[in-house]
Amino acid sequence: MINKEFFGKYLSNDIYKYTLTNSKGMSVVLTNFGATIVSINVPDKDGNINDVIGGYETLDSYINADGYQGAIIGRVGNRICNGKFSLDGVDYNLYINNGPNHLHGGKVGFDKRIWQVLSIEDSNEPSI
């Protein structure tokens, strides 16, 4: 089962939380802002459901976060030293956002993008 819930607005775009629940009761909550995992809820040995991620409660918390909590990162993962690299003889200068370095895609990396979501519910296990 997939549940879609309004989460807030970012740059005039609607942001949603998507809750995917499987046949065993496990669920994951994702948002189209940064393709971010908000929570993963799994049963413990006694059947009690627990969130093992500990994500933020509000969209604003993700927007204003210093880190990349639960978000997809990119175009690169980790740091590009001094925000510069060469590829096939072409020099590239990247946005500096971590001391002297470029980190995880810069100022507007994948973590700040609004992702299009395609929901698939043609079996017992939902996916987006």
Functional labels for PLM-detected ranges:
Residues 1-128:
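Surface-exposed acidic/polar loop and edge beta-strand patches at domain peripheries
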